Amino acid sequence: MIFRALIILSFFSLINCENGKSELPPVVLGYIALDYLILTDPDRSSVYFSTVRSLDLDIAYETDAEPFTGNYIVGGSNIWNVTDSNLQDVFADRGYPVAVTVPTDLSEMNEIPNQNRSTWSVNQLLDLVPRYRKKSSNFQSTSFFIVYVRGQLADAPGVIAVTISGVLGIGPPVIFVFKDMIEQFSNIASPDRVKKAEQMTVTHELGHALGLVNAGIPLYSSHQDKDHGNHCTNSSCGMFWALSETKVETFSPASPLIFGQECRDDIRNYNP
């Protein structure tokens, strides 16, 4: 897909979330600090929810920044079942099937060389796309590219992940996950917590890529947190602007759906 617009740089939510650990900076625990949204081409979401019949994830990871795989210790479910279940739910009840494919093992993902960066500019992140993206998309099938890197976003150290769209030539939105930021959720006493945080983050970013909240999928009810850009006012929703340790700790992979009813209503009532 070719986007015809310039990019708007939107500082939606520079996070200043207290994490309760004196040795860590208070900006660490939060969700997106910025999103890149397209000025025009609103058909981005309308394609995903009309003509697309298959969706998969093309995942790459920098050496030593690999995603968590395997099973959760508590409950034993597959870690990537969280992302898969939420995507399956997104495309359920549309009157036609959409095949969703989510890789669950590192053998299904692409390891890329260590980039030796402690900070990343947006352009440096985008340089990875033509080098390592393996799959293309069309109006029948969509492949979202997710890249795990070490380091942090320059001038925004609290960013856990970022979704970039609207850039000529990159295709569908690209998600970058900063593994160093994810690891701030690590806890020896609760080894599943960092894995849950990573999956909640990936699912949140995919929500943005698909068009939530009011970023392509129109609002069915008034629930956009305009102070934080395209995020939901429902603090229990996976599209809320911040992710706290408590929220991650209480999340159960046995009940993997993280989008609140407001966001799910947006999707269910969107028929482009």
Predicted regions and their residues:
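Short, solvent-exposed mixed-charge patches
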Residues: 271-272
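Bacterial signal peptide processing site
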Residues: 18-21
